[in-house]
Regions:
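Glycine/small-residue-rich loop that forms an oxyanion/phosphate-binding "nest" at active or ligand-binding sites
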Residues: 46-93
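N-terminal glycine-rich anion-binding loop in soluble enzyme alpha/beta folds
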Residues: 1-44, 111, 116-154
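Positions that flank functional sites
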Residues: 64, 96, 141
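Short, well-structured alpha-helical segments in soluble
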Residues: 38-52, 157-166
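Periplasmic-binding protein-like
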Residues: 55-60, 109-112, 167-168
Length: 168
């Protein structure tokens, strides 16, 4: 619903799911398997959605866009742009743009739904972008669907853990 709530008047959203099995994630190994499943299906999802001839492609999943750091993110974006023939926006782009709105901040805290292996890649990405990740908290969600079920109370609690005067 969030993407539909943000759409401009006259714009329609067309979705294509990256098909992955709804399997439990209980370890870094499981999280790596989830990432393999995403990679195996990402191109198919892009190919399906471009049949409606969209003007722009917004990727609503984030983990893959941070994986491997900034350079890998840039390469992924180029690959998806080449595959789709469209301009592409990704979660990693959105994070960089949002942080730029705050001026010259450098020291950040990051909250993710990921397991430690995912958090490591997010940290690498932000470090590559010139930020110092002072604190990070991964919620270790027990599966891709469970990310959507994190409660506002859980998020507020995690944000309080991350807060501090040592971050910008």
């Amino acid at each position: 619903p969030e993407y539909d709530e943000m759409r401009a008047r006259g714009v329609t959203n067309h979705f294509s799911r990256v098909w992955i099995p709804d399997e439990p994630v209980e370890s870094d190994e499981d999280f790596n398997k989830l990432m393999e499943n995403i990679r195996a299906e990402l191109d198919n999802a892009v190919k399906r959605v471009i049949t409606c001839r969209p003007d722009y492609l917004v990727m609503g999943m984030s983990s893959e866009t941070f994986w491997g750091g900034l350079q890998t993110s840039i390469e992924l974006k180029k690959r998806i742009e080449d595959l789709s023939g469209l301009r592409v926006a990704m979660g990693s782009d959105a994070c960089r743009a949002a942080l730029a709105c705050y001026g010259e901040i450098k020291r950040i805290a990051v909250l993710t739904p990921y397991w430690p292996v995912g958090d490591k890649n997010v940290r690498t990405f932000f470090t590559d972008c010139g930020f110092e990740v002072v604190r990070m908290k991964g919620l270790k969600c027990n599966g891709p669907v469970e990310i959507a079920y994190v409660t506002p109370t859980e998020l507020v609690s995690a944000m309080k853990e991350l807060d501090g005067t040592d971050i910008d």
